[in-house]
Amino acid sequence: MSKAVGIDLGTTYSCVAHFANDRVEIIANDQGNRTTPSYVAFTDTERLIGDAAKNQAAMNPHNTVFDAKRLIGRKFDDPEVTNDAKHYPFKVIDKGGKPVVQVEYKGETKTFTPEEISSMILTKMKETAENFLGTEVKDAVVTVPAYFNDSQRQATKDAGTIAGLNVLRIINEPTAAAIAYGLDKKSQKEHNVLIFDLGGGTFDVSLLSIDEGVFEVKATAGDTHLGGEDFDSRLVNFLAEEFKRKNKKDLTTNQRSLRRLRTAAERAKRTLSSSAQTSIEIDSLFEGIDFYTSITRARFEELCADLFRSTLEPVEKVLADSKLDKSQIDEIVLVGGSTRIPKVQKLVSDFFNGKEPNRSINPDEAVAYGAAVQAAILTGDQSSTTQDLLLLDVAPLSLGIETAGGIMTKLIPRNSTIPTKKSEVFSTYADNQPGVLIQVFEGERTRTKDNNLLGKFELSGIPPAPRGVPQIEVTFDIDANGILNVSAVEKGTGKSNKITITNDKGRLSKEDIDKMVAEAEKFKAEDEQEAQRVQAKNQLESYAFTLKNSVSENNFKEKVGEEDARKLEAAAQDAINWLDASQAASTEEYKERQKELEGVANPIMSKFYGAAGGAPGAGPVPGAGAGPTGAPDNGPTVEEVD
């Protein structure tokens, strides 16, 4: 199987895909998003790429670089560059006739070429693919707009090289989109395909003629400064005016308020592609004032009406340039996230007298999709001759259950391809526990309280037994439609129960998912500390209970003596009482108590085992940290469900 990938290096967002087993997979990044912002940020301590960079842009505008694609392969005195540079919050300076960005990084002033910035984004896409494929990725097909000239193409290729990629080929974005739809295989005779690509920052229309698998770009047109961000701006201006009308205050003077408003506007715009109305709620947006309002799809369409209409001019231009009538267009392909907007789809369809455009592949993923197919062909993946490609879905967030101490134990990790099935064995937390509550959560955080509860059910009728003895097998099964079945079986009695969770019930929207995963990144360090703390607590608790149980074993007192037995029992009980009273103690405190308890227990237990003849010494004792046989304390094998 080839490890070559296709990368759509976009102005505002980038996307990576891989072709294997007769299908293309769009690879989600570490935030669970299938597209990654083309942003790089520099701070006093680190460099951020993608979502992390875009999320902090409001706080760090001068050192957050975007739109590198508008600068790459151009001269500093290019009017396009001069014009763009005026509007950027970061500095663009002239270095030997080339534009470079100047930022503060780790306390020093540094300059980076557009190639370097693009290479950082490509590196991020490469790592995203490597994390998913579990192996190094070297070969890639990278896409560029059809109007890119030779120096822009070469500079893009250089960016790939800097990122450690072997760029197999630079292909045109419209060509990639046509390949994604298998249009090169659709008919034997020459046919004309119009690609309408409305992205985040740019708008490109291309007319391709495809003849026996050979693509020829007949004409291109477009607007390098029209895209989703312009629609966001219209919405932002409208909302800022409304805020001013309601509160007699102008929030446009505050960069952070504007950035928050823009984020909300982008989210509202996305929602309006599928709903007729959406609400915007921003707490303390400006000078402590909360901003709540709602906006309808009709109002949004009216705000952007002239922009939407202007998309048809380039369509007319490519038809004129290629001397074709609109009736001669065989296929229309919609590409770019902004073509999800219903009004845009309708305008295109109406222009072509009701002809329906191709849009079965996500428009923001179609280019990477086609690039991945091309990469597979170039690396000799024979199966790619079959065009029956499927778009595989993945589980966007990890799924698991709550175990002792409110910990999220993941059964299905994020980005697992669905359908999938996974089972794990758990046990009880208390002696003679009659039942367990299975609570199903989705999310990336260590503690279930920070994740999203999908559903819960009780498995009762467990026969009385000491803690850690009953074996409860929990199975997660997601089908191709994303419907989750969770079942639990007590292996001794065969008692079972299950729950079915469908997509819409209690599941998160894409926005929520993005938010949660972004939070998970931010809190990762805290999460790790918390996990260690709970582990130390569970370990101590388990150790204390096991010691206490040992004392009650029938021959224990004879072997170690009445006094030692009492001493051990008291120490164990003391630790249990302390634990009950100190649920929020630190990792160090738990470890300290564990040491103290071991100090009392080890000599006594050695005496007991010495008398019993040869023993495992004072290794960890079965319980929270171990299976029925006692396992190293590097993590649970049998966990407990409260």
From Swiss-Prot:
**Entry-linked Gene3D superfamilies:** 1.20.1270.10, 3.30.30.30, 3.30.420.40, Actin, Chain A, domain 4, Substrate Binding Domain Of DNAk, Chain A, domain 1
An annotated GO cellular component of this protein is:
plasma membrane
Q: Which Pfam families match?
A: HSP70
Give all Phosphoserine modified positions: S552
- Biased amino acid composition, Gly residues: 611-628
Quote the PROSITE patterns the UniProt record gives. HSP70_1, HSP70_2, HSP70_3
The listed locations are: Cytoplasm
Could you cite one Gene Ontology molecular function of this protein? Answer: protein folding chaperone
Q: Which InterPro entries match?
A: ATPase_NBD (IPR043129), Heat_shock_70_CS (IPR018181), HSP70_C_sf (IPR029048), HSP70_peptide-bd_sf (IPR029047), Hsp_70_fam (IPR013126)
Sorted alphabetically, which keywords does the UniProt record give? ATP-binding, Cytoplasm, Nucleotide-binding, Phosphoprotein, Stress response
- Major localisation: cytoplasm
Induction data = HSP SSA4 expression is restricted to conditions of stress.
Q: Which domain of life is it from?
A: Eukaryota
Which segments carry the region annotation Disordered? Answer: 608-642
Cite the NCBIfam families for this sequence. PRK00290.1 (NF001413)
Instruction: Please state which protein family the record places this protein in.
Output: Belongs to the heat shock protein 70 family.
**Miscellaneous remark of the record:** Present with 17900 molecules/cell in log phase SD medium.
Q: What is this protein called?
A: Heat shock protein SSA4
State the species of origin.
Saccharomyces cerevisiae (strain ATCC 204508 / S288c) (Baker's yeast)
